[in-house]
Structures are given as C-alpha cells and as structure tokens.
C-alpha cells in the first residue's frame, strides 16, 4: 500500500478514511470553527484542516459523494479536483449547491471523496495529420441514447 504523508493543520481535523474494504475513495471531512451554509445556486470553499505530500507521479482527486449529490444536489463544480504532488497547502473542497434549499456543512461532515492515482506527464509531438479510426471526429452523444 502506498504511504502518503499527511499533516493535521488543525488538531480537530479528521483523517481521510476508506468506508469499506474495497472503496476506491476515502471520505474527506469538513474542519470548521462554525457551520457553513451553501445557499442554492452558490458555492463555498470548505476547509479540511489537512495538508498532504504525495509522491512524485501521483495526484489526489477530490470527487463528489454520491449520497450528497442524490439527496441534496451537492457536488464539486471542478470534479474531479486535482491536488498535484508538489502542492503543500491545505486541502480544501469547493461545494456547489444545485438544489433549492440551503445546505448546512458542519464540522466533521463527510463532504467529498479522495482518490489517489498514478499520473504520467507526456510530451506532445506535433504532426500534420492523425491516424484514422472508426469513430473519427464523432463525439458528444454521437452514439445516441438507445439501448445497449
């Protein structure tokens, strides 16, 4: 298992945890002095009280929690949010409220999932043409919505 260094910037911060044995993402919790209300149609930056040191060649992705999305229409507008290996500041989560009701975030609430993944930097090679494929330039729904 990959070891990632983590610092509690606030002693009240909760470490990310896997909710189940085979979970891909760890639950990330809010670290707040007072509740934050995310008004309908708005976004708020939520502190976690944590900083991480990822190994070179890795990123951490912050993703919405499915239960918050389904029940409250709460999501992350930049999902997946990327935390680069060279970032050393506090991990914060942008929550957006797509619902009609205000959403209150309290200290300790699980607000996002974190997935740590290997990444590779690439270099582009400029060419005059690209190879042909069956799909070609088809995109954005070109295969339709019909049954499988």
Curated annotation (Swiss-Prot):
SUPFAM superfamilies: dUTPase-like. It catalyses: dUTP + H2O = dUMP + diphosphate + H(+). GO terms for molecular function: dUTP diphosphatase activity; magnesium ion binding. The keyword Metal-binding applies. GO terms for biological process: dUMP biosynthetic process; dUTP catabolic process. It holds the Pfam family dUTPase. InterPro entries: dUTPase (IPR008181), dUTPase-like (IPR029054), dUTPase-like_sf (IPR036157), dUTPase_trimeric (IPR033704). The keyword Ion transport does not apply. Pathway: Pyrimidine metabolism; dUMP biosynthesis; dUMP from dCTP (dUTP route): step 2/2. Keywords: Hydrolase, Magnesium, Metal-binding, Nucleotide metabolism. Substrate binds at residues 65-67, 78, 82-84, 92. Its EC number is 3.6.1.23. Its cofactor is Mg(2+). This enzyme is involved in nucleotide metabolism: it produces dUMP, the immediate precursor of thymidine nucleotides and it decreases the intracellular concentration of dUTP so that uracil cannot be incorporated into DNA. HAMAP family: dUTPase_bact. NCBIfam families: dut, PRK00601.1. Belongs to the dUTPase family. This is Deoxyuridine 5'-triphosphate nucleotidohydrolase. The lineage of its organism: Bacteria, Pseudomonadati, Chlorobiota, Chlorobiia, Chlorobiales.
